[in-house]
Amino acid sequence: MAKLSCSYLLVFMLVFSAILMVEKVEGEECRLTIDKATPCHLSDCRLSCYTGYNGVGECFDDPNVPGPDNCGCRYNC
């Protein structure tokens, strides 16, 4: 019976520590429009976002910036 209780305690501790680690990893996500002067090329956008902000670059239409597509960067703040 003591072995069973110890096993339950160990499993509970592992699950609890995993939950705590997941909460730390989840952060606030920021979004920034980069390179507003030129049209978006996906490969260049992803490269500049990754090197500058360690994020994911994507092309989207920003209504505040003139032009068809702009490069946006999503990254952890």
Swiss-Prot record:
Swiss-Prot/TrEMBL GO biological process terms: defense response to fungus; killing of cells of another organism
Disulfide bonds: 30-77, 40-59, 45-71, 49-73
This protein's name: Defensin-like protein 161
GO CC field: extracellular region
Signal peptide residue numbers: 1-27
Family matches, as PANTHER family: DEFENSIN-LIKE PROTEIN 159-RELATED (PTHR33830:SF23), DEFENSIN-LIKE PROTEIN 184-RELATED (PTHR33830)
Keywords: Antimicrobial, Disulfide bond, Fungicide, Plant defense, Secreted, Signal
Protein location: Secreted
Source taxon at top rank: Eukaryota
InterPro entries cross-referenced by the UniProt entry: DEFL
Similarity section: Belongs to the DEFL family.
